[in-house]
């Protein structure tokens, strides 16, 4: 397998500048300063929310073009519809398997740690006003409605909305049509291929504004919710963070090792994106950059285009851990006994509802509301217990989801024999000489079957 030169591919990052010129350093500084400001001057911190919101809106502005161009050019280059179906099928098998593991891990940890034991909360005494909005939104989450929502009203409507799956749907169909057009479709493919250059250049421009967005978002979070809210529910928050860490290092670490790469090196490779996700509490904020870096790490372009956007809806490992752990925490805190049958129902409902909340703001909390509504044994009023700390768990959910999707892309690429190991090693090792060798000709993975 040898990388082929590509003069018009996305411009690579140049991570070998001094550390104080690198993006991740300034994101760290922004997070620290934002946290200090939010803690010392809560009112001022809350006023900075527009900074984080504006940055996320800017990133979402570019997500649709990035997904569309990556998928269409990737599929049209493959020119085999069967290959697209095979990649999608393998991705869904992976997503289902690891989503199941994440849900089971949350259940196991809740039984071992018992984070809600001894709280003796009476659900009647809980204030339910603040969770009413989440409960109302959860009523709209149905599997049929979710599937129907993937189909857009018009060909252009996905590009003016915020439903990633609709963009994915249109891009796959257009890419297949372009592949079937053969030589007559080449001019269109070349045009779309050329458009990737300014689009990914725009992504790099927007990423330079990440410290500003992270500063505003973290200042708002600390200013509004405060670190004190973590004390009372520290058992739940700590259990969730440790469980997520266990999932990433042990489960994802094991599958990474089996596929020939290190999870720790992958995390180091994606450190700037992970810090951005931490600061903004949104894994979507780093989606364009993740797609670019996965291609640079040797993954097939068509695989990246299919797996990453789909994973943002179907491969939510952090959200799955949160669902079962939080549900059992509420049951323990309210002294609600759950039989094995109840827990099995909880598990199955969580598996389905986590897919139906894809792309919804506050998806983790809304999905939990939908799950508890179907499993009435766990009092839905108990959600009021965790509302105050849910924002702090949101960061961990987003980070785990993000790492899970990066690993999924590499695993499916290897499974599909579309992973350039030489290019992956160069990217993850991060040596300057190797980097310069890799990008001497703006290389992009090209794998012969």
UniProtKB/Swiss-Prot annotation:
Signal sequence extent: none
Record-annotated membrane-spanning stretches: 20-42, 62-84, 91-113, 164-181, 202-224, 239-261, 344-366, 370-389
Gene name for this UniProt entry: dctA
One Pfam match: SDF
Main location: membrane
Cross-referenced NCBIfam families: PRK01663.1
Compartments it resides in: Cell inner membrane
Descriptive protein name: C4-dicarboxylate transport protein
Physiological role: Responsible for the transport of dicarboxylates such as succinate, fumarate, and malate from the periplasm across the membrane.
